[in-house]
A protein has these predicted regions:
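RNA-binding basic/glycine-rich loop and surface signature characteristic of RAMP-family CRISPR effectors
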Residues: 1-306
Length: 306
């Protein structure tokens, strides 16, 4: 079934003694002024991994093959062929139809350029950069010792010493938007053969947005969890575009982590007639969401999912 309403909100990721998104030097990504952030790709990676584990068709993901005794990475054409069969360069529309059968392409869009086939799809779901909202974050560097000798050391007698960089605690806040109307052109093109962005696809995105990071299992991301999420559901037919909601979020820590959205009071008041409801997800053992300054009319729209 086609999704007919827009959604705006935030996804909160907590990193504790972990490195949620490293740069090429292995350090947590940061802006020139030192603000730590995570790219949209890091969150999309987690979501795609969960979809893969659930048996969904995922196109834009790194996969590997063994060729002539070597472990290699598949190119885009090979990944497409694995999912949909050989590309028919004489049937450009068939390729486009297949792209929308992959959950990640349907959700996030894709740039597909293989042989004579070129498609650029703007996804219904857009995720922004996720900035750390916690002011007391420290970056920690640890020396780590490999159990193996350093092949470059004289006499090969020295063990390899490396480093592991992580944050003691950070709270990343990703703004996102869901706009099903971006596929109106393709719906007109394909007619009844294409529903556009569906409720089923949205629910799969929503489930992954709430759980995918917690499910990651690696040395760097083992301390990263889904901390909270807020979904502002507009009414069906509303064409309003809300500003990035992450700019209205602050994070502090007392006995619990306090996620404060009171700065959004004027914004939510201005759009209240366009809003169907506001869903807030969090673990109340660890987190508290403060919206005490919002008007009673806005509070009535809030549904807490603890």
């Amino acid at each position: 079934m086609e999704k007919k309403n827009r959604v705006f909100g935030v996804i909160g990721i907590k990193a504790e003694m972990a490195n949620w998104n490293a740069d090429f030097n292995g350090d947590p990504k940061n802006t020139p002024d030192g603000t730590i952030f995570g790219s949209d790709k890091s969150l999309k990676y987690a979501i795609k991994q969960q979809w893969l584990e659930n048996g969904e068709k995922v196109l834009m993901v790194k996969t590997k093959k063994i060729e002539k005794g070597n472990l290699l990475v598949n190119n885009l054409e090979e990944r497409y062929t694995k999912l949909f069969g050989k590309i028919d360069t004489k049937n450009n529309i068939e390729v486009l139809e297949n792209l929308f059968k992959a959950i990640d392409t349907l959700t996030f869009g894709a740039a597909f350029a293989v042989k004579k086939t070129n498609h650029s799809i703007t996804g219904a779901v857009q995720i922004n950069q996720g900035f750390n909202k916690y002011e007391d974050t420290n970056i920690i560097t640890q020396d780590i010792l490999s159990p193996f000798a350093n092949s470059n050391a004289e006499g090969n007698a020295q063990a390899t010493i490396g480093k592991m960089v992580h944050v003691d605690e950070a709270h990343y806040c990703y703004g996102f938007s869901v706009n099903p109307t971006v596929y109106a052109e393709y719906k007109a093109l394909f007619g009844e053969n294409f529903e556009g962005y569906t409720e089923e696809a949205y629910e799969k995105f929503k489930e992954a947005a709430l759980t995918a990071v917690t499910g990651l299992n690696s040395a760097a991301k083992g301390g990263c969890i889904n901390e909270y999420a807020i979904f502002i559901n507009l009414k069906e037919g509303s064409r309003k575009m809300l500003p990035k909601f992450d700019t209205f979020v602050t994070v502090e820590k007392e006995d619990k982590v306090i996620v404060n959205i009171n700065k959004a009071k004027n914004l939510l008041e201005a759009y209240k007639n366009e809003i169907e409801n506001i869903e807030i997800y969090y673990d109340d053992e660890l987190t508290e969401v403060d919206y005490s300054a919002l008007t009673e009319e806005i509070k009535e729209l809030i549904k807490e999912k603890i």
